[in-house]
Amino acid sequence: MLSPSQEEAVCHGSGPCLTLAGPGSGKTYVLTRRIQHLITKGGVPPEQILVITFTKAAALEMKERFIGLMGQEYPVVFGTFHSVFYGMLRREPGFRTYRLLDHKSKQAILKETAYVVKMSCAEDDLMHMEQEISYIKNTMVALAEYASPYFPNEKIIKLYEHYEARKEVYHLLDYDDLLVKTRELLYKDPSFLSKWQKRFSYLLLDEVQDMNALQFEIIRLLALPDNNLFAVGDDDQSIYGFRGARPDLMFSFENYYPGVKILQLRDNYRCKARILQASLALISHNEIRFTKEILGQKEGKGNLEVVSLADKKAETAYLVQILKQQ
């Protein structure tokens, strides 16, 4: 049974909607019920519904829960950004000869590239190089404007350019390229853009607070012209800034989607009162966030303990000790 705030989200009609959903608010249930509503009440062909999550496991879980809800399988598309866009690219003649770069091969190309541009090939340095190349692509920052926290800027520029050139020689794509190339095609090829806009007339997006600028731009293009985008997220839960996540994009929804309906799932079914109150008191110190009313629905007060620890290693040891005592 849906709560009033859940029902409002599920029954949202056409047009853009941003639903604020904290932990324990029944977010996945709302998304699956929303898909059901679009098909059974809205008359939307299931093959025109695209549901994007951030992990393969989350996509599989949502699909299984949807099938359980409907009692049978429907051709709704569930996937991650990378899996969905890889599927789109593979259908294009210009990309049929390209292969996806696995981690081992990527490390080999990075090592070769680092040697050519006279950079360290140490394991930690290679890891930072990989992270920085990914960050540049996902934030869409101009190479000339990127400031590396680990290497001289001119070295990173040479590394990036040589890495891209080597991949092109072997017709290889890394995971970030799946998004970069999709965006390029959406902008450069009107027929490609139109085809996928018609293919997916309704978009549902999970964990919107973890989106980066590149992902946001692709979704913005795909959702046009009707903007039937149902986005669910919680700005209080964003932890992937180091990967280029842009939770601030949630605050810009009204600029990109005029007339967007902003809803909130108010009920928390996971936490007891004391834990919920303490969490809200702490997070309320964030200067930039959506103001939320969260109502605890779980009986009992709950136990709360404040512990100060020296570092992450001490924190991990403490948690292991607590778990062993349970």
Model-based region annotation:
Residues T19, P23-L31, P258-K261, D267-Q326:
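Helicase P-loop NTPase motor core
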Residues V44-K56, V76, D206, V232, ...:
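Conserved RecA-like ASCE P-loop NTPase motor core of nucleic-acid helicases/translocases
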Residues M1-R96, S194, D248, Q277-L280:
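P-loop NTPase Walker
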Residues A58-M62, F85-L89, S238-G241, C271-Q277, ...:
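Switch/connector loops and helix/strand junctions flanking conserved nucleotide-binding motifs
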Residues G13, E73-P75, P93-D177, F200, ...:
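ATP-hydrolysis module of ASCE/P-loop NTPase motor domains
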Residues G15, V44-Q48, Y74, P225-N228, ...:
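Short glycine-/polar-rich loops that comprise or flank the Walker A/P-loop
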Residues M1-C11, G15-T19, L50, A58, ...:
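Conserved helicase NTPase motor core
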Residues F66, E112-V116, A278-N286:
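Conserved AAA+ ATPase "sensor/coupling" helix adjacent to the nucleotide-binding pocket
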